Amino acid sequence: MKKGIHPEMKLITVKCACGAEHKFYSAKENVRIDVCSSCHPFYKGAGAAGMIVDTEGRIEKFKKKYNLD
């Protein structure tokens, strides 16, 4: 690698709206984010069960269309 052309990496604190703080190495300054792994529903346990949402009967419509009952 060439010397003097790469940005300096430093330890920064990423602060989430939920109050959690995570430390990473980055060339940027401190960062604020809206969601993180501490507050996102997928990582809180609602993700696997809550990912399939059938609000308009799409699954039933598919089963009926292809006779999968």
From Swiss-Prot:
Its cofactor is Zn(2+). GO terms for molecular function: metal ion binding; rRNA binding; structural constituent of ribosome. InterPro entries: Ribosomal_bL28/bL31-like_sf, Ribosomal_bL31, Ribosomal_bL31_A, Ribosomal_bL31_sf. SUPFAM superfamilies: L28p-like (SSF143800). Binds the 23S rRNA. Part of the 50S ribosomal subunit. NCBIfam families: L31 (TIGR00105), PRK00019.1 (NF000612). This is Large ribosomal subunit protein bL31. Belongs to the bacterial ribosomal protein bL31 family. Type A subfamily. One of its GO terms (biological process) is translation. Keywords: Metal-binding, Ribonucleoprotein, Ribosomal protein, RNA-binding, rRNA-binding, Zinc.
